[in-house]
Amino acid sequence: MLDVLADSGPLGALFNRRDKFHTLAIEFFRAHGASLRCHTTWAVITEIMYFLDFSAAAQGDFLEWLYEGHTRGLMRIATIEPSDLPGLAAMVRKYADRPMDLADASLVWLANKTDITNIISVDRADFAIYRTSKRKSFRNLFPV
């Protein structure tokens, strides 16, 4: 089982047929889904729910899929504590020229916490720039 950080793009694309990455996301998870353990955050989940706001059915399907993945041990959801906020604020300031949103900051925070640097994201440019606190780069496994 390969541990990966999961960003909103590939996960949200699974549930939006109009998303330009929908077919790629379907193919990626068909080929690799059973061998991946995805780690994400509530900030990423919130972003996905916003992206799927065009359809309560799509939002419900996503939440059920998330729950199923969690119960099967294929999806882990990390919770940011109030004590983590100063570190997130420092990251947002550090990458102000990008700019870094909370979902991205939460994934870098999670990488720092877990030492996982494999990621699936459609945001290749930003995750090519971001570094962990140990100065490790991210390896994007999503083929965009």
Placement of each model-derived feature along the sequence:
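Alpha-helix/helix-capping structural signal
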Residues: 9-10, 43, 83, 125
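Residues that scaffold the ATP/ADP-binding catalytic core of kinase and kinase-like folds
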Residues: 13-14, 51, 130
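Active-site neighborhoods of divalent-metal-dependent phosphate/nucleic-acid chemistry enzymes
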Residues: 76-118, 122
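PIN/NYN-family metal-dependent endoribonuclease catalytic core
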Residues: 4-6, 24-55, 76-79
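Acidic, PIN/NYN-like endoribonuclease modules and their adjacent C-terminal/linker elements
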Residues: 1, 108, 112-144
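A general alpha-helix detector
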Residues: 10-11, 47-48, 87
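Metal-dependent nucleic-acid phosphoesterase active-site entry motif
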Residues: 1-20
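Glycine/small-residue-rich phosphate/adenosyl-binding loop
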Residues: 49, 53-71
